[in-house]
Amino acid sequence: MFYPLSSNTWGEEEVAVFQEVLGKGRFTMGESVKKFESAFADKIGIKNALMVSSGSMANLVGLAALFYKKNNPLKRGDEVIVPSISWATTYYPLQQYGLKLKFL
């Protein structure tokens, strides 16, 4: 029995879309991203969606959304529980907003 260490996870349809977007020369903040954000928001039943470049950016944007929300659920100096073992990108956005890290 053979188990490959890796395999291609992209189908022909996905590859064609990648090529189309790359061929336009603008694959960040372009029309394709705008369409995806709108379709994603519709699919999950929300008003707006925001596509970001990485999980690290998603952490930062999500934290900013909580920090600047009208009822301000997070304030500078608040304590946030975080895992002791994680990536630096878990911690940096929290420190950037002046939150205190509590490692578990």
Task: Locate each region found by the language model.
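PLP-dependent aminotransferase-like
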Residues: 68-104
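Conserved PLP-binding active-site segment in aminotransferase class I/II-type PLP enzymes
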Residues: 1-75, 96-97
